[in-house]
Amino acid sequence: MALSINHFYFTIFMEIIIYRRRFTRWGVDGTLVIKGTKVCNTIEHPERFLPAGDYEIAFVSIANKSRKMPVILRKGQAVWEVGINTPCLKPGNGPMTLENGCIILGKAAATGLVIHSQEYFDRLCERLRKASKKKECIKLRIIDWGSDEISIAF
């Protein structure tokens, strides 16, 4: 029996990994990596962060935002189930106002603080939009690592 290429379906995906390095009362500091290369740092609320694990990212219009945002979909969550309380990747400076497991992107300045957030957010969004236009599935993996366990390159 001969099989044609039509019998196989390949899913192309982009995998984003966030290595959480430091858990303090000022926030959860992490490093965002794509294809083995550090893209930026992350910061999350010290208590209201997502559990480590696998998620998907989709661009969705959120009612209280002026543009489509990269939202973080929990396992089995459909895009049409997204609401204003859905966690997302976003620009910002510090984590204390974050709710719902949102993640701020930027350059680490101190524990619990990132700078140049809008610049890093825009760069990552452009990269995610390109992947989305190519119909790539965007996966997010969050791993809890201590600073001693993560490669010095990150």
Give the location of each predicted region.
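Cell wall/extracellular polymer interaction/catalysis modules
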Residues: 8-139, 143-150, 154
